[in-house]
């Protein structure tokens, strides 16, 4: 079968890839410049086809704790946000890492401290590679350089998260989330084999 090449934004590529690889649940909260991830999932209605749960939480803190619950029950779950929203998630991310649970966090970065700007930036590099929240842990970090990699890294991130029992993060520049390029989306598959990995020794 010929590959299907589509034109879409990086944020949209994340959403479509998540549906196609069989993600069980997405819990998020709108914040620019990543809002299209949640919007695309809402438009595609994957709960009608794959059974994927898509839920807009009441806050970033609530969203990451929903991810914690989903990951603890053995589901493939993810969230997305942008810089100040990811800062609000840090305690939850630390708890998920401490419990040795796999999940995916997507950070489509803003620039600058505080609320920052919606200008393209790599401002959260140090926060991400040092783990983020309290405690001696690190995140598995993938940094896409194209819209194609935005789509490709969703499956790779889940593979690594389940293999190493650790949260993974896609750390994307805001411009990649917003720019449009041609993309070949992953074949629709279910990553059920990931759940066969050993569970945490601490559970």
Please name every model-derived segment.
Residues 203:
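Cytosolic catalytic cores of cyclic-nucleotide second-messenger enzymes
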Residues 42-44, 94-97, 155-160, 185-188:
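Short, solvent-exposed amphipathic alpha-helical segments in soluble enzyme
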Residues 120-174:
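Conserved thiamine diphosphate
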Residues 1-131, 138:
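Thiamine diphosphate
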Residues 176-178, 182-190:
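Rossmann-like dinucleotide-binding core of oxidoreductases
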Residues 110, 172-179:
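Glycine-rich beta-alpha junction loops
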Residues 192-199:
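Conserved small/polar residues in nucleotide/adenosyl-binding loops
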């Amino acid at each position: 079968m010929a590959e299907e090449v589509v034109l879409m934004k990086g944020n949209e590529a994340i959403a479509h890839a998540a549906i196609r690889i069989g993600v069980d649940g997405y819990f998020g909260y709108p914040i620019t410049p990543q809002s299209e991830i949640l919007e695309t999932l809402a438009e595609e209605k994957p709960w009608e086809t794959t059974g994927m749960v898509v839920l807009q939480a009441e806050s970033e803190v609530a969203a990451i704790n929903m991810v914690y619950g989903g990951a603890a029950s053995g589901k493939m779950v993810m969230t997305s946000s942008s810089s100040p929203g990811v800062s609000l998630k840090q305690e939850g991310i630390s708890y998920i890492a401490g419990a040795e649970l796999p999940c995916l966090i997507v950070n489509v970065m803003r620039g600058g401290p505080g609320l920052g700007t919606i200008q393209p930036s790599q401002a959260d590099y140090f926060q991400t590679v040092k783990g983020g929240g309290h405690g001696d842990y690190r995140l598995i970090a993938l940094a896409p350089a194209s819209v194609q990699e935005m789509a490709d890294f969703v499956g790779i991130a889940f593979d690594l998260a389940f293999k190493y029992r650790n949260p993974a993060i896609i750390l994307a520049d805001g411009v990649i989330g917003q720019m449009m390029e041609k993309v070949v989306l992953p074949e629709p598959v279910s990553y059920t084999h990931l759940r066969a990995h050993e569970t945490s020794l601490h559970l």
